[in-house]
Amino acid sequence: MAHTLYIVATPIGNIEDITFRAVRILKEVSLVLAEDTRHSRILFDAYNIATPMEAYHDFNKEKVTPKYVEFLKNEGDIALISDAGTPGVADPAFNLVRECVRQSIDVRAIPGPCAMITALISSGMPTDHFTFQYFSPKKSAQRIHLLEKLKHE
């Protein structure tokens, strides 16, 4: 029987902004995948998390995704974390999650901080409808074109 991939939200600025459940999951899984293990080590040290950690990022995701799918099938549970906030929002988590869903491996989200929602609710703008755009284009003309397109959504 396959194990579970946990998508665990991590703090986005204040190290205390993590749930009890997230800390428990990070301690209980067999392996944690992190965008930047050096950055995540700070969180691990603060909460005495001793779980083995490996890198999962944009530069290795294609190569290592099959390895972690096999790990989930045969060895144990994995927690996937990003540098800050909720994995899967404009980061490499999507690749592993998609492959797990394709192969009927259990995927569970452990909610917590999300920069997008934090910014929205503190903006004073209506929250019943919004559009998310990751990074805007660098060139001014492309940015203006994108904003013109989005203003009617």
Where are these regions (language model features)?
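Catalytic-core regions built around general acid/base machinery
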Residues: 22-28, 67, 71, 96-103, ...
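Short phosphate-binding loop-to-helix
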Residues: 58-73, 92
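Short glycine-cluster motifs
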Residues: 73-133
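Conserved helicase motor
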Residues: 55-63, 135-140
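Glycine-rich loop at the start of a catalytic domain that most often binds anionic cofactors/ligands
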Residues: 45-50, 72, 93-94
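Beta-strand/loop-alpha-helix module characteristic of Rossmann-like adenine-cofactor folds
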Residues: 2-3, 118-153
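Amphipathic coiled-coil/heptad-repeat helices and related helical stalk/stem segments
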Residues: 18-19, 64-65, 93, 142-143
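Glycine-rich, flexible N-terminal cofactor/catalytic loop recognition
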Residues: 1-59
